[in-house]
A protein has these predicted regions:
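Conserved N-terminal phosphate-binding loop of PLP-dependent enzymes in the Aspartate aminotransferase
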Residues: 1-145
């Protein structure tokens, strides 16, 4: 199994190649590399994230995602909000493209991502309610323009 995640190392990119069973002995040390693998700082961040992953944290993340969805669905032009936890996709019905909306948000201090015609939110798991409210305010202002 291969895994790579931008931000999985506590905000830093990290990657891994995990081998099991018959494949466990296929690679020797140094035979294989990864763009995001082996960085000691990212690895320390990744270990910290894994150590903090508890049922309570995941329930908190789900609650934060539900909070965001509730407010985003009330915003002008929002058709749907999909996703799980804090990984959210927002389908917009607007004359502006998702990219234009994201650029307007960035100018006001909110960095969001896009995927084709959708806005994507990927805040850190430890985002505070105050930070969520600041982001929701900016997104609401931009969508209302």
């Amino acid at each position: 199994m291969a895994a790579a995640r931008w931000g999985g190392g506590g905000g830093l990119p990290i990657g891994a190649c995990l081998l099991f069973g018959k494949t466990a002995g296929v690679f020797s040390y140094g035979d294989h590399g990864t763009t995001f693998g082996g960085n000691p700082v990212a690895c320390a961040g990744g270990v910290s994230i894994v150590e903090r992953l508890t049922k309570d944290l995941l329930l908190e993340v789900q609650a934060k995602g539900d909070y965001l969805k509730t407010f985003i669905l009330k915003m002008k032009g929002v058709e749907t909000v999909t996703g799980m936890g804090l990984m959210l996709g927002i389908k917009i019905n607007s004359d502006k493209s998702a990219r234009e909306i994201a650029e307007s948000c960035l100018r006001k201090g909110l960095m969001i991502l896009t995927a084709h015609d959708r806005l994507r939110l990927l805040p850190p798991l430890n985002i505070t309610k105050t930070e969520m409210n600041e982001g929701l305010k900016i997104l609401n202002e931009v969508l209302a323009e």
